[in-house]
Amino acid sequence: MTVLTVSSPPIEPVYPSGDGEPVAETFDHLYALLITLEVLRQYLVGEQATVLGNQYLYYAQGYPRLRTAPDVMVIFKVEPGGRDNYKIWEEGQVPSVIFEMTSASTRDQDQGFKRTLYEQLGVQEYWQFDPKGEWIAEQLRGFRLQNTPEPTYAPITDGQSQPLQLRLQAEGRLIGFYRLDTGEKLLIPEELAIALR
C-alpha cells in the first residue's frame, strides 16, 4: 500500500491593522497627529508618496509581532493613498520621515526603542513633538540619519526637513510647516477655510 503525504501550503501570517488601543493619549496629541497628517497629505498631493497615521509599520516578513505604529509617517516612491497597514517588504520603501507625538509617559519608548528601530530601518528623519511641553522644553526636535557605516541619528539644528523640503517649528500645540523654496506656511484646515472665505 502506498501512502501519499500531502504537505499543506505555507500559511501566510496574519498582519493585523488594529490593536484596540487609543489613537492618542490626550486631545492635544490627537489634534497634533491629525493636523500633521492632513497638512502633509495636502502638501504631497500629486507626488509619488503617501502619508499614514497611527498605522502598523511591519518591518520583518513572517513575523507579524515585529511592528510599530508611528504617529505619522511619510513614504516616498510608493503609490499615493491610504493603506490598512504598511509592510516594508511589499512596498519596497522604508518611511523617509516619522513623527511621534510624545509625552512624559511615552518618552522612554520614543527615545529608546523607537529611535533605535528607526535608525536601524534607515528612516532618514525622526521628529519628536511634545504638544504639552512635558519633557521637551522646545517642544519639537528632529534627528537626521548620518551617512556612516553604523546608522546613527544626529540632532537637526536648523529645523529643516530635507526629505520634505520644509522648515518645521513648534507653534503652540501644533507643528508649523514652511516651504523652504518660498517661506510660505502650509495652512492647517481651519486657516485654509478662513483664507478661502
Spans of model-derived segments:
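A short acidic/basic microdomain associated with nuclease active sites
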Residues: 47-60
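A structured, charge-rich N-terminal accessory region that forms the first stable segment of a protein
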Residues: 25, 29-40, 48-50
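Short, solvent-exposed loop/edge-beta patches enriched in aromatic
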Residues: 43-48, 66
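C-terminal interaction segment
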Residues: 1-25, 38-39, 57-70, 77-97, ...
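Short acidic/polar active-site loop segments enriched in Thr and Asp
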Residues: 124
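A structural signal for short, well-ordered beta-strand segments and their strand-loop junctions
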Residues: 51-52, 127-130
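Generic preference for hydrophobic
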Residues: 51, 72-74
